[in-house]
């Protein structure tokens, strides 16, 4: 095994994500970072479909990011591993799994809009993972751009303590550059790609506000740095280096967010933003050691090359040339190509064929990876998103798993020709392996293939990829809502499966107490005493319930949030069997549906609508007609109206077209799953009747 010297010290690594609402200029920002760091030598524009990071045909046509593209750049002696994530709400899973393996992030805001609906979602995800962030207020040259208001929106809408470390010089078409509040110097830019800014004295008309803003910055970081607090109390000035160190310390708490400004498209302020990434975002050594489960114990994994190898697989992708690519983040140790690893999640041994350093969809083969690296492996057959990989000789442990939302929308698919059936099956298998929020199954009653995902665009992209990548033409049914079932009452139910007609019969008999188990999923409790049901049959009672819950008891939808306590029953020495107890348990659930108050649940979506003020009344009325509950309305600084509402998914099909026609093409909206709620009786009755489920 060849062990090479480490090229970059771990303290010089920055593993970061670029995250934002759709159209905030996130991918353009990433392109500029790659250009300035010498990773690419020509800039490709997203709106022209030429972006380096948006490499999928669907991304280039639609001008949006769908998958998380990974790349590595170098800046001032630091190695920056960058993941550019999607801004569209249907692809939130890509953001979720990227943030899980990153140490820091740049949140890109549109200077005119400030915080937008999807900004809230990705910000919340980053907060869950305690990811330190920098705020980059982009598009400062846009009409209506306002740096101060955009930063304030982080505080008011996200509760994030965002504080400017720069102040803008001009805005909209007059945007020229910024004042560096740490070093108290001004930079202006000519808009050329190289972004060689000119350092100038702070313009006289901005000296007063620059001093005020620097003092606000000092006051804000004083809460995190005692030395600065003492200097502030004594009325002394704070030197630049001390202030810089304090900003870094504050940022690493994930409670303080330095804000910078610029225009990525117009080549203004991006280099200073990369400097801020280096200066203020953490290395793998600055973040708390990751926790892992070792049996019943929680252990911490120290970020060091000297420890056993450990990594988390955070993305699986099908590549037409090399097969399955598994993206992983190394948390400890060293791994050479050709080595064996243990997938500790599945307890399987796997061989790493090749290790690739990725740049969007191009790649460079490398010999090894070390702590802090993000790379892709070729050759892993059983590893899926969220699995832990450890060295062959390491003591078994599992890094904390990722939890993904269940799909809320489904469609039936049929291959256009019989010849395409096998290709369809292969394509769906590969695509569901890549995306944990995409599910596919066969409807037992109709024999149709069903695909399920997070939204209409999500399923559109899946169908498009089947056509392009797997050569499968399909006929697509109308989108369907993924309802759920649950129980609302507690009852003790008997389940019997007894058949005795000569020869060996069947005998299973159970008494189960069923209770609602709100938001806790399925819970099975064994309270059998005195051997009334032999131990070996208990797990088959549980299995019978689980299998029945998958297909439901009302209308064929999964049954959720049930606690089942097996407390009595009986058995027969000869006729009892595993199957008999599975059937008896299943019957208990089916027979008890009336006593248990079985009911249908419908998915409720968070809907955020942005419209010109003139259309406010019409849109409010339309949302109410769709059974929407209005949660909040606001008028933005640019005069647009925003409406937040909770609306059943079943009422939102075709909304994009309806909104366009109601607002003459000037309205837009975002929608994301929020929760399941009891469906109104008339709707529930109609669905149950239509499904004719026995």
Curated annotation (Swiss-Prot):
GTP binds at residues 20-27, 84-88, 138-141. Keywords: Cytoplasm, Elongation factor, GTP-binding, Nucleotide-binding, Protein biosynthesis. One of its GO terms (biological process) is ribosome disassembly. GO terms for cellular component: cytoplasm. Disulfide bonds: none annotated. InterPro entries: EFG_II, EFG_III, EFG_III/V, EFG_IV, EFG_V, EFG_V-like, EFTu-like_2, G_TR_CS. Pfam families: EFG_C, EFG_III, EFG_IV, GTP_EFTU, GTP_EFTU_D2. SUPFAM superfamilies: EF-G C-terminal domain-like, P-loop containing nucleoside triphosphate hydrolases, Ribosomal protein S5 domain 2-like, Translation proteins. GO terms for molecular function: GTP binding; GTPase activity; translation elongation factor activity. It comes from the Bacteria. The keyword GTP-binding applies. Residues 11-285 form the tr-type G domain. It is found in: Cytoplasm. Belongs to the TRAFAC class translation factor GTPase superfamily. Classic translation factor GTPase family. EF-G/EF-2 subfamily. Catalyzes the GTP-dependent ribosomal translocation step during translation elongation. During this step, the ribosome changes from the pre-translocational (PRE) to the post-translocational (POST) state as the newly formed A-site-bound peptidyl-tRNA and P-site-bound deacylated tRNA move to the P and E sites, respectively. Catalyzes the coordinated movement of the two tRNA molecules, the mRNA and conformational changes in the ribosome. This is Elongation factor G.
């Amino acid at each position: 095994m060849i062990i090479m010297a480490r090229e970059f010290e771990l303290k010089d690594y920055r593993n970061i994500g670029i995250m934002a609402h759709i159209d905030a200029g996130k991918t353009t920002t990433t392109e500029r970072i790659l250009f300035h760091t010498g990773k690419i030598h020509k800039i490709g524009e997203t709106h022209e479909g030429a972006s380096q990071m948006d490499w999928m045909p669907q991304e280039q046509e639609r001008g949006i990011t769908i998958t998380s593209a990974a790349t590595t750049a170098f800046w001032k002696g630091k190695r920056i591993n960058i993941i550019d994530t999607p801004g569209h709400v249907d692809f939130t899973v890509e953001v979720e799994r990227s943030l899980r393996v990153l140490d820091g992030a740049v949140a890109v805001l549109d200077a005119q809009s400030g915080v937008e609906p999807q900004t809230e979602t990705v910000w919340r995800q980053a907060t869950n993972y305690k990811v330190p962030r920098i705020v980059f207020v982009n598009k400062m040259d846009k009409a209506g751009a306002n740096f101060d208001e955009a930063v304030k929106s982080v505080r008011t809408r996200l509760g994030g303590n965002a504080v400017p470390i720069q102040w803008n010089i001009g805005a909209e078409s007059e945007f020229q550059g910024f004042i560096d509040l740490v070093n108290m110097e001004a930079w202006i830019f000519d808009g050329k790609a190289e972004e060689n800014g000119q350092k100038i004295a702070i313009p006289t008309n901005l000296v007063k506000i620059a001093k005020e803003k620097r003092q606000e910055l000092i006051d804000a970081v004083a809460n995190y740095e005692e030395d600065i607090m003492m200097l502030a109390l004594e009325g002394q000035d704070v030197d630049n280096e001390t202030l810089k160190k304090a900003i870094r310390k504050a940022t690493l708490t994930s409670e303080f967010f330095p804000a910078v400004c610029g225009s990525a498209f117009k080549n203004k302020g991006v280099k200073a933003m990369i400097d801020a990434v280096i200066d203020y975002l953490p290395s793998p050594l600055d973040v708390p050691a990751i926790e892992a489960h070792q049996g019943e114990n929680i252990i911490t994994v120290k970020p060091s090359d000297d420890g056993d190898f450990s990594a988390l697989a955070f993305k699986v992708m099908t590549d037409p040339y090399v097969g399955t690519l598994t993206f992983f983040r190394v948390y400890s140790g060293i791994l050479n190509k050709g080595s064996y690893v243990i997938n500790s999640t599945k307890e399987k041994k796997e061989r790493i064929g090749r290790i690739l350093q990725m740049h969007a969809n191009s790649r460079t083969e490398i010999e090894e990876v070390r702590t802090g690296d993000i790379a892709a492996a070729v050759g892993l057959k059983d590893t899926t998103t969220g699995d832990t990989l450890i060295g062959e000789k390491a003591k078994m442990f599992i890094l904390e798993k990722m939890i993904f939302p269940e799909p809320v929308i489904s469609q039936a698919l049929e291959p256009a020709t019989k010849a395409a059936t096998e290709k369809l099956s292969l394509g769906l298998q590969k695509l569901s392996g890549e995306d944990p929020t995409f599910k596919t199954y066969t409807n037992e009653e109709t024999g149709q293939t069903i695909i399920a995902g997070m939204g209409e665009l999500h399923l559109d992209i899946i169908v498009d990829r089947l056509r392009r990548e797997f050569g499968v033409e399909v006929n697509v049914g109308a989108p369907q809502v993924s309802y759920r079932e649950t129980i609302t009452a507690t009852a003790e139910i008997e389940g019997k499966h007894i058949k005795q007609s000569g020869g060996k019969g069947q005998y299973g008999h159970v008494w189960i107490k069923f209770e609602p188990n709100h938001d806790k999923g399925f819970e099975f409790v064994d309270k059998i005493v005195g051997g009334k049901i032999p131990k070996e049959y208990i797990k088959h009672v549980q299995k019978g319930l689980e299998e029945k819950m998958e297909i439901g008891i009302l209308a064929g939808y999964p049954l959720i949030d049930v606690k089942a306590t097996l407390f009595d029953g009986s058995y027969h020495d000869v006729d009892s069997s595993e199957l008999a107890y599975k059937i008896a348990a299943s019957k208990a659930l089916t027979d008890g549906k009336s006593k248990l108050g079985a009911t249908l649940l419908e998915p409720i979506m968070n809907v955020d609508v942005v419209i010109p003020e003139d259309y406010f009344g019409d849109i409010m009325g339309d949302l109410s007609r769709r059974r929407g509950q209005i949660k909040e309305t606001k008028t933005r600084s640019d005069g647009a109206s925003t409406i937040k509402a909770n609306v059943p998914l079943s009422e939102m099909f075709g909304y994009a077209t309806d909104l366009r026609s109601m607002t003459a093409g000037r309205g837009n909206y975002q929608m994301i799953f929020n929760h399941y709620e009891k469906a109104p009786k008339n709707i529930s009755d109609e669905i149950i009747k239509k499904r004719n489920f026995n």
